[in-house]
Amino acid sequence: MEYLLPIHILAGTIALLAAAFAICSEKGKKIHITAGKTYYWGMVCIFLTALPMSIITSNVFLFLIAFFSFYLAFAGRRFAQNRKGIAAIVDWIAVGLMIAAGLGMWVLAVFYSIENNSQYITLTVFGFIAIALGYTDYKTYKQQEATGKKRIARHLTNMLAGTIAVVTAVLVVNVDIEPQWLPWILPTVILVPVISWWNWKVMK
């Protein structure tokens, strides 16, 4: 744990800075692509450190959040790379794990609710998002629609959602707000409308 946590924090910082560069740079240009790759590998490092930390501490909440957050970066990168819109086996596996993580969050939310742990609200919301995004990507793959503007929109949605996950982690660690679930949900409430607007702009 003493080595994993500093690496985890460093990776989160790198991912957040890289995401900012990717968002602010011109799409398709070298800076955007380099920043996007840096963001992705930062998310990989976050995932690979979060998993053992969650297992060591028996933290099912963190375990599920790790899969949820990494899927967003993974799917975002896959949509950027796959211009033909034909899903590979790894894409189907990833979608299945994302939906399973969402269902797992709902199950854990029930237990948290019984225990009067207010984080059941976070799990309920994130579970819905995981299932919704996973199912949307599943339909996109099945119908082979991930080409042209639709591909860019799916890339945008997943990458920005992953960025929300990183922003959320920073907020949760550094800001003490009550109730406990509020810092987990607040970035999503504020930034999801931005994603929706950006998608509309891409698709019109």
Features from the language model and the residues they span:
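Alpha-helical membrane insertion/targeting regions
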Residues: 1-204
